[in-house]
Amino acid sequence: MPLNNPITSALLADPEIIQQNRLPFHAHFADQTSPEMPLAVSLDGEWAFHYAENLTAPFSDWDTLTVPGFIQMQSLQKPGQPYGTPHYVNTQYPWDGHEKLHPGQIPQDYNPIGEYQRSFTLPESWASCYLRLNGADSAAAVWCNDVYIGYTEDTFTPAEFDMTAAVHPGENTLTVQVYRFSSGSWLEDQDFWRMSGLFRSVELFTKPEIHLEDVFVKQDFTPDFSSATVTFDCKVSGAGTISVVFDGEEQSAEVGEPAEYDSGVVFGKGEADPDVEEDVQDVSFTFTVEHPTLWSAEQPNLYEAEIALLNEGALVERTGLKVGLRKFELKERQMLLNGKRIVFKGVNRHEWSCRTGRTVSREEMLWDVKNLKAHNVNAVRTSHYPNDPYFLSLCDEYGLYVIGETNLETHGTWQKLGADGSDEWTLPGARPEWRENVLARAEAMLERDKNHPAILIWSCGNESHGGKTLWEMSEYFRNTDPSRLVHYEGIFWNREYPATSDMESQMYTPVADIKKFLAEHPEKPFIMCEYSHAMGNSCGGITDYTEYAYEEPLYQGGFIWEYMDHGIAVTSPDGKPGFAYGGDFGDRPTDREFCVDGLVLPDRRNTPKMDAVKAAYAPLKITLTDTEAVIENRNLFTDLNAYDLVFASSVNGKPERRAVLRADCKPGGTEHIPFPFALPEAGLACMTVTAIQRAALPGIPAGYEAALGQVWHNYAVARLTLPAPQLVEMDCNVGVKGEGFEYIFGRGKGLVSIRYNGVQLLDDTVRPNFWRAPTNNDEGCAEPFTFAFWKTAGLYARCDNLTAETKGDFVIARANYTLPDGQTLPIDFAIDGAGRCDITMTWQGTRTELPEFGLLFPLRRELTEVSYLGLGPRETTADRTAGGKMGAWNYNVRQDFAQNTPVYPQECGSRTGVYSATVTGSGLNIGIGFAGDGMTFSALPYTPHELENARHLYELPRDDNKTVVRCAAFQRGVGGDNSWGAKPHADACFAVEKGTSFRFTIQK
């Protein structure tokens, strides 16, 4: 504990004290070197660490922790979790219910302090020494050799301090205290795990005799983009020569006696360090580029720039920059990139790693960017804070549009239990004591990230209601950087300052309501900053949104919530690997599994939802008739001739013919291309057209399948007629048998046995099924309550009567089921001499909606290999068929479940549009086949009820007890407009009425 410690609870709680001695913000330099000496030294690695529960509590014994990293994530790996655990809440604050607090107060009983300490030796060549904390959650104070250096808030932007006066030759001691809660915690109520620590890199750096303090690259274009002017506005300290090389041209200037440094707006009350003030001179260089190569997500062209600083002719500092030339503007109520109407096909992305929390490795960031590009995503909203600068550099390089979002969310100060409860405590509003705290966050982000071409829009934050302060922030963005637009969704909640946002931005609005809004309010372009809530098995109806972007010019796309599940990798008490979510560490209050709401699993495995995203966000829309392909080029800058168009026909999944064509079609155009050969007329005849990228682009290899379209027809196949099988009627059972097959129906039970070639295939009785394991979306709109009857209807349906007779070439057994409410359901089993069993279930009751309508087959455990003809290769649903491809597919039941199931167990694994399926098993030499006319099929290790009863995958029974096959006329769509009340769209809500029937076949 440092002897000189000015940090008090009052200081931490004061919203007007957000920094002490912090240096002015500036652009991030990813590439700054010197031939004379290292300009920076990383302090990442092991640090000494100890911990206290609050400001007055004693510290623990010294331990070691890794920097960068979160205290609580590393605590999970230690016996007894001595430094606390992560705490997940969504809108409510983590202290809610523990202490009664209002803005301007912070927890007293539980406000942990983590004190980090390490030694360092100053390089002999350094005449100055500065410290950079790239991320400290939520506030930090710094000492060097027991000399107090300074204090900072704002978790997600860098804080720099001058330590020159405190360091000495030889070994020095650096101490950093990190406070879990501060005044900034009221402004950081994002929907994520609450933790603390030095979670981004820590480094020392020095400044040579002449040093580039800052640079802002600005650009302008002629109306036809034939010429660009590029200006480098530089701030330089010291005296000497500055040289800028850009596009093959070099310009230089002498920097002499500089004017006194004007640091611009420095928000926040605090003590000024007289030794921090520097002399800085402004220098600008302007270049003209003829016929510039423009930057976009499709073609992320970057120019190289180099800024060299020389002292008496000797190079002392070199800074490399990558510059993307592009123009983003609002014109005639539309957002344009390089003169073209843009459509955002985006995701919201929290920073997350299942083992290290928001400390994300460069390898993970690169994987994310490549994965997004591989699924046709073109935009990212950095929800809800500035992301690591390396991620933004990857977006520049690989081509992703970015909404850079200010580290601001005050959701819990105004939204109470889902309703607008704004009052005098709502932040920031127009409360003067919070103004500079809020505005400083905008300045920190803009200054750090202003040179990234990927950033098209600055966002004022998330879900912080409205008011004057947010409007002032938007004006700061516009005045400082007019090359970008400003976004803020909160004007939806508070229309007092509508000019805060240049666009109308909403969350989770149904398409029908968007249409209505734009009909009444066509003043601005419209985006969905959050839509298609991806929690659990979700994203149904996503194409309704993407298609509307090409129907309504004012609707310019949106950002799916969200990219990744925020699960934490854990080992269950019985040794099984799994993922934890809110509440699993005893953290209360909590919002439980609401943090596992992403398109990819916590370990970055893609879920089937990503297949739908890739299809919905495709750069081409390919629609097939029976004779031609209609291709709509939705690119902004890429001609259709950048793709090979592969036409392929198949019958029953087997390839027939193939041809590769090319066509010219400008961006925004439509091309009609006749089939090079006819669609077959036998079996399941399918024509598939795929667009294959010809040349490699950043993140996308040559040969990448960018889009596809299909058309298919199922032609009936004549059956071989054989004599009827043998009917065996006894007191308790009815048997039907023939060569190589036997079915047994139990009186009072139904179908109890299926034997093919003498092998028993059933593990239990076949029964009607009307239930699916509730999804998160089902629970959010109370469908388990609404449809509760259907859970018991299938479980407890009673076979009251069984009849059997021979009719022509068939034996027909009829099982008459009575449901718990007295309704009846006859199921006919018509078995021919080959052992094929045509099953027809017919609804006799009144019209009603229900989750599923079909039969459940509990098969023996060995039957785990599935081959099917339908949409695949992975799960599709009634409202999420986009991304499914008609064809012949194979999977292992247990592996498919393990790879694709949501963290929170629920319905999964269904295949739609299935015409046939076969389930086999090793060692049995036999299997069972299912055939239907585009039915819904699933094969899982569990029943819907077993899935429903577990909260984590490791709570499920063993996965090798049985295989549960379900064949259904339909299964209700999964929905996804939101997870707290929205039902699936009407075309995915199915009903039965008197006479509704479902027919399919089982066979060996």
Please describe what each predicted stretch is:
Residues 190-211, 566, 575-624, 634-642, ...:
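Catalytic cores of secreted or luminal carbohydrate-active enzymes
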Residues 116-118, 157-161, 281-287, 669-675, ...:
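Short strand-edge motifs at loop-to-beta-strand transitions and within beta-strands
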Residues 82-106, 153-155, 163, 167-227, ...:
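An acidic-aromatic loop/edge-strand motif
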Residues 71-74, 83-89, 135, 180, ...:
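Beta-strand/loop-rich accessory regions of lumenal/periplasmic or secreted enzymes
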Residues 144-173, 177-191, 256-279, 284-295, ...:
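Beta-strand-rich ligand-recognition modules
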Residues 3-8, 12-19, 30-34, 48-52, ...:
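Accessory beta-strand-rich segments of carbohydrate-active enzymes
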Residues 2-35, 76-77, 89, 147, ...:
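Extended substrate-binding grooves/exosites of carbohydrate-active enzymes
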Residues 144, 227-270, 283, 305, ...:
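Beta-strand-rich binding/interaction modules
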